[in-house]
Amino acid sequence: MPLHVEVRGSGPPIVLLHGFTQTGRLWGSFGERLQGDYALVAPDLPGHSGSEAVRADLPTAAELVAEAVHATIGKEPCVLLGYSLGARLGLHTLLGTDLSVRRVVLIGGTGGIDDAAERERRRQTDEAMAAELENAGDIGVAAFLDRWLAGPLFARLPRSAAGRDERRRNCASGLASSLRLCGTGTQEPLWGRLQALTVPVLALAGSDDNRFGIHALRIAACAPNAVASLVPGGGHAVHLAQPDHAWRLVDHWLRA
């Protein structure tokens, strides 16, 4: 089953891969700024919104992304920009598909969890959240989103920028599937493969997002053409909370 894709704007293509509980439309004013200069190719990822019936792990989702992009823009080289879940999926797309990518932006990204015991603990946490979603059904999605967005990852994200209405387009079964199949606990660690990347990579994170700031620096150390940039005072969803600052960093790097 193909992914649902929307294209907005015109110009060189940027493929946008959203985060967990989001949709291809949820890029806020950051996306609007990009749309002024680029064609935004924005799929709904497996288990989300228009792709809610799609069930796929990260390697399979990467193939679906490549197929969707090829069906939309052909073989034209693109910029690949992913946030959180989308950043992890972006790495799988780079390493496991034939998508022609000229530059990559990873916001709040990671190469995965190295330690097997920690990875299993994360898998169990994701499974518990998936079961919670399934037990509550679609009527419980709003309450789940409130708890999700109240977590420490999003402490810096203003309520007005969180996109709750757009997130509510998701269904319980789709989100549960995403947690089970694409959660960090089920992801193969990719750190040892990043040295094979030759495409330029910008790893972006908020300076107050300690864990993912460390991941950004590690990505820059592992991939030969990667650089890291930390947005002062930024949290995990830095492109939504500080869209102008994030856009300036990304735009400057894309034009360099």
PLM segments and residue spans:
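Conserved alpha/beta-hydrolase "acid-adjacent" motif
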Residues: 210-215
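Short beta-strand/loop motif that positions the catalytic acidic residue
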Residues: 197, 203-205
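Conserved alpha/beta-hydrolase catalytic His-Asp/Glu region
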Residues: 120, 134-193
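Gly/Ala-rich beta-loop-alpha elbow adjacent to hydrolase catalytic centers
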Residues: 82-86, 90
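Flexible "cap/lid" loop of the alpha/beta hydrolase fold
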Residues: 95, 102-133
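Catalytic histidine-centered segment of alpha/beta-hydrolase-like enzymes
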Residues: 234-243, 247
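Active-site loop/oxyanion-hole signature of alpha/beta-hydrolase fold enzymes
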Residues: 28-32, 41-81, 248-251
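Conserved HGGG/HGGXW glycine-rich cap/lid loop of the alpha/beta-hydrolase fold
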Residues: 3-52
